[in-house]
From Swiss-Prot:
CDD domains: HATPase_Hsp90-like. The keyword Cytoplasm applies. This is Chaperone protein HtpG. It comes from the Bacteria. Homodimer. Residues 340-556 are annotated as: B. It is found in: Cytoplasm. Pfam families: HATPase_c_3 (PF13589), HSP90 (PF00183). The gene is htpG.
């Protein structure tokens, strides 16, 4: 009998997710059982942890398990666990709302591409709501461990606009999820169909999965039912590696990550000696939707002596490896460890160092053994990995070796060139690794700063990610070679410079001295200086900054973060070989000369910044000079 019954509306995001999920996951509908068993496993883990300090929560029943039963007459499947259970407040919080930051943004990213939506929803983690793929009504009966039998809770919904919640009597702790199957989903009333799904998805979990099966006498007559354990019920990471199949590793990844896609690679290691721990680390094949939400917790599952302690433990991985998934099971931490204790713990620091090293080794091996798969990894997680160059001094060179760049060598926007690749192709006499930062690959590829390098056949790395200016400021050299921006006014080609060209340049500087003086006189304090340049072949002018000054891209980064950046004062460089520059140098009329210098300066600023402060004035001036 139920009391205190109320009907409540779903949070709007839940309604939207339910409709999208039912349609986009229909082809993969059997995962509902995996998700519900996974939830039961989590509930058992949470009870074990709380019972460390409150053993009375076991209520005399310490054999944790999940039981699955079928009622063909009623058309129901019941998934029952004796884990931690839920209070009325927890039921409303967990089953009526989605308490995840960025949920609206996530839902807005979903569209009409069913296959893509399926992957996205899988990454989001549908859990309990997957029940509605096969059921037109779901009933939940639950009681929190340690609460009175009268404090049971009933939750029921048809998966549409609302749900009902009420108080009930429930003798045993834990949760029963009763699925009232749709008429066209009766295939799941087959015991053997359920056995097959459990064998496929849930054999690896440490919780016993039992199914209610019929018993027969010698004559084949049904005599009753019994509970039969149908999974290994041994935590996968405690088993020997040679006993575990690739499929089991993949399914375990999906169990702990709630991702639908297979992982890219994994590493399972048992360490004995000064420290004793087992780690199972995975690199996902796709970036989760919330990867760049800093408030979203990312981390490993922590077990101490095979007892689950907590999820999303971030201290064992540096932030730039936040995409790593997996678990750590250690004997070197106390069972009552808290997040606060972990922060200050020497054991934690030692484990973090070891797990970081292991993760980077996994990526190094992937980059060496499978270029195509590593490219897939880089496309998904490259932006995050770049953060490591500035955040992890101890592993800076290892991280830098894993970074991939677009380059003038490939004529492609794909970031596939490593620093080692670049060094192997360096020209004789070349002492530096040259790079260029810009707003986009197209802007970088078409930058006038490349003209001399293209002419001489010198490779340049093209950086156009938003993080790149920050990233490159922390990477000043690699393998003994300095990294040098080609947009700097004091660019030095060293042994790559042409001696004959240098002599010609000296003559031109004398010829154009008065021209440069006139130009600087007009531009005044708007520029640092006006000089001739020999880095251009097709363009009349560029602007550049000194090596110790803030670059254009860094100033943009400051502005994007809402911070005040120092004003960038450029060197204005003019190409003496260009016909336009030669013509302007001969103009005697001061007003006309100034108009042309202004036009060239604005053109150079536009090429450098991508925008002008006064585009209308620029267009008027250009039209005026073209019509003259």
């Amino acid at each position: 009998m139920s009391t205190n019954q109320e009907t409540r509306g779903f949070q709007s995001e839940v309604k939207q997710l339910l409709q999208l999920m039912i349609h986009s996951l229909y082809s993969n509908k059997e995962i509902f059982l995996r998700e519900l068993i996974s939830n039961a496993s989590d509930a058992a883990d949470k009870l074990r942890f709380k019972a460390l300090s409150q053993p009375e929560l076991y209520e005399g029943d310490g054999e944790l398990r999940v039981r699955i039963s079928i009622d063909e007459a009623l058309g129901t499947i019941t998934i029952s666990d004796n884990g931690i259970g839920m209070s009325r407040e927890q039921v409303i919080d967990h089953l009526g709302t989605i308490a995840k930051s960025g949920t609206k943004e996530f839902l807005n990213a979903l569209g009409s591409d069913q296959a893509k939506d399926s992957q996205l929803i899988g990454q989001f983690g549908v859990g309990f709501y997957s029940s509605f793929i096969v059921a037109d009504k779901v009933t939940v009966r639950t009681r929190a461990a340690g609460s009175d039998a009268s404090q049971g809770v009933l939750w029921e919904s048809a998966g549409e606009g609302d749900y009902t919640v009420a108080d009930i009597e429930k003798a045993g702790r834990g949760t029963d999820v009763i699925l009232h199957l749709r008429d066209d989903e009766k295939e799941f009333l087959s015991e053997w169909r359920l056995r097959d799904i459990i064998g496929k998805y849930s054999d690896h979990i440490g919780l016993a999965v039992e199914i209610q099966t019929k018993e027969y006498d010698d004559e084949g007559k049904e005599t009753g039912t019994k509970w039969e354990k149908i999974n290994k019920a041994q935590a996968l990471w405690t088993r020997s590696k040679n006993e575990i199949s690739d499929e089991e590793y993949k399914e375990f990844y999906k169990h702990i990550s709630h991702d639908f896609a297979d992982p890219l690679i994994w590493s399972h290691n048992k360490v004995e000696g000064k420290q004793e721990y087992t780690s199972l680390l995975y690199v996902p094949s796709k970036a989760p939707w919330d990867l760049f939400q800093r408030e979203q917790k990312h981390g490993l599952k922590l077990y101490v002596q095979r007892v689950f302690i907590m999820d999303d433990v971030e201290v064992f991985m540096p932030n730039y490896l936040r995409f790593m998934r997996g678990l750590l099971d250690t004997n070197d931490l106390p069972l009552n460890v808290s997040r606060e204790i972990l922060q200050e713990n020497k054991v934690t620091q030692s484990l973090r160092t070891a797990l970081t090293k292991r993760s980077l080794q996994m990526l190094e091996k992937l980059a060496k053994d499978n270029i195509e798969q590593y490219q897939q990894f880089w496309n998904a997680f490259g932006l995050v990995l770049k953060e490591g160059v500035g955040e992890d001094f101890a592993n800076k060179n290892q991280v830098a070796a894993l970074v991939r760049f677009a380059s003038t060598h490939t004529d492609s926007s794909e970031q596939a060139v490593s620093l080692s690749d670049y060094i192997a192709r360096m020209k004789e006499g070349q002492k530096a690794i040259y790079f260029l930062t810009a707003d986009s690959y197209q802007a970088a590829k078409n930058s006038p700063h490349l003209e001399l390098f293209n002419k001489k056949g010198i490779e340049v790395l093209l950086l156009s990610d938003r993080i790149d200016e920050w990233f490159i400021s922390h990477l000043t050299e690699f393998d003994g070679k300095p990294l040098q921006s080609i947009t700097k006014s004091d660019l030095d080609l060293g042994d790559l410079a042409d001696k004959e060209e240098e002599e010609t340049q000296k003559v031109q500087e004398a010829e154009f001295a008065s021209f440069l003086e006139r130009a600087k006189g007009y531009l005044g304090e708007r520029v640092k200086k006006v000089v001739l340049t020999h880095r251009l072949t097709d363009t009349p002018a560029v602007v550049s900054t000194d090596s110790d000054e803030m670059t254009t891209q860094m100033a943009k980064l400051f502005a994007a973060m809402g911070q005040q950046a120092p004003e960038v004062k450029y060197t204005f460089e003019l190409n003496p070989e260009h016909s336009m520059v030669k013509r302007i140098a001969d103009i005697a009329d001061e007003a006309e000369f100034n108009d042309w210098i202004e036009l060239l300066f604005e053109q150079a600023l536009l090429a450098e910044r991508g925008t002008l402060e006064n585009a209308t004035a620029f267009i008027k001036r250009m039209n005026k000079l073209l019509g003259a």
